[in-house]
């Protein structure tokens, strides 16, 4: 019987990539629930307001009309309570993102994250990553692990959106009081949808990336990146994902984050 060689380093990388993918999925769920809660509450709030107006205007109306309006108000209240229980309660664990800011060297974080993305997905997808990294030995005071998760999610999303043979570019700069990372890729809807290709994110997350959205809303799979940036007092933006488009994802955080 031939023994299968064990590579502890490779196993550790796979475990870390799986952990980062699970974190991204957790924040994707949070974003989906938040969007559903908002979109369901808006019409219910309008209905509740109009029901109140009608109750005031029909205060002396036939009792059957008053009972009907009371029933409408009760139904609306029940729907709001259902949203609280089903959509809002599960978001408690991610609603407040605490960070632990400590000083660390930036370059090792970038090197480790790039190596992880290449190992876990890019090499298998035949997608190359060109990186432009800051010179010298810059350092940050931030939550290293959360930034690693955000950068991994940005890069992995770009690889997911890229066809075989394409190139993802990554640039990181430390300019004065701010550190910024930019990931650029060409979007292929076919690559996102192809079940034969290796993927880090599930089919729902990949389909949602291509959905039309308000300019202020991020793709759900990138919700973790936005939350990490905001928790550090920074910003996260990206252009719309559309087949054939060139998209840049940008994350910027202060070099001295509080926390």
Describe each region flagged by the PLM.
Residues 55-63:
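Short acidic helix/loop segment immediately C-terminal to the autophosphorylated histidine
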